Structure formats: C-alpha cells, structure tokens
Amino acid sequence: QIKIAKEAGYDFVSLRTIPMHLPGEPSFLPQDDPKLFADIKAALKEYDMPLMDIELARIRKDLDINEYKPAFEAAAKLGATDVLGSVWTRDRAWYTETAGKVADMAKEFGLKFNIEFLPWAGVRNLQEDITLVDDLGRDNVFVMVDTLHAGRAGVTGAELARTPRKYFNFIHLCDGPAPEGAECKDTVLDNIKDDL
C-alpha cells in the first residue's frame, strides 16, 4: 500500500491499523506485531512516504475504545498525525462522552481526531458533525468530509463553503455512481440496520 501510494503520486499514506472485527478480515496490526511495525517503518523510509493517519476508531457501544490506545501509540511512533473515526449509535449523550475520551487518548500521542459523518451512521450529516465538534470543545477534533458520503447525505458545495475552515483538517476526495439519495440510503440501511 505504501509503495502504491508513492507510485500513484500521493504525498501521504493512510493505513487501517484498527481492526473492524469482520469475518475474514486480514490482520494488519503493527501495534501487535514488531516485525510488521519494522517493515512499515522501513517502507515509509524507503519510499519517502509519510504516514498521515490511521483508521478506523469507531464509536460503538459494543466496542472497547481502550483497544485503540496501542494503535494510536504505534501510529505516533511511525510519524502519523491523525486518526479517522466514526460514530455508530444515535445516543448523543453517550457518543459525545465517548468521542471526548477517544480525542483525549489521541492527544496523548499528539494525534488529531477526525470524525467522519455518513448518512447511515450515528452522526449522519455535516451539521451533526459540527455540533459534535462544538460540544467536544477540543483543539484536536475536526469534521472529516468524504465527498462521496457527503453527497449521499445531501450536503451541498454551498453548505461546505459556508462552514468555517476551522472545522476541517483534511477530506476524502472520493467518487462513484450516485443513485438517488433515498435509494442509496435504503439499500445501505437494509444491510447494516442491526448494527445501529
């Protein structure tokens, strides 16, 4: 992945080092594997490719956020500056408190915590994400916009343009076929409704 990022002309690479606990998921956990950690460190140096962020620090009631700490520590040692996360519950009081704990944990290692909204997740649109960032009131927490998901959430360019720059740290510039919003959301929700 690091080599491909370099060959494709990117300035940074992102690595998914926090497991999703999915069936058949490959193990890619440098925090638990000293050889893998050393190999990643060597590849970053060989290809002159800085590690920008790791993912995905999900906020869900069935996940223990303390499992993220070793991943944050390893990422910081590899030069990362950021963590990407998302929220998977509609319990606002709980997810706000828990997101604050994740942000504080990230800050221990000099990392910024970027929260992505998705129209079928717990934080579903730009305004909900901004509200969460405001409620947290921490200087290392930002809104993360994935342009594909933002479009599916009904976010417009004008809405983004009106949003103060302070909320944004980086974006995911993604594209793909865009079925009508309701069709897209209904299809995805049918697949993940038991997770929310």
Identify the residue ranges that each predicted region occupies.
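Active-site groove signature of glycoside hydrolases
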Residues: 75-93, 109-119
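A conditional alpha-helix N-cap/helix-loop micro-motif detector
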Residues: 33, 64-65, 95, 122, ...
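Short Asp/Glu-rich motifs
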Residues: 24-25, 63-64, 94-95, 125-126, ...
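Acidic/histidine-rich catalytic cores of soluble enzymes
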Residues: 1, 101-196
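N-terminal pre-domain/capping segments
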Residues: 1-82, 100, 107, 138, ...
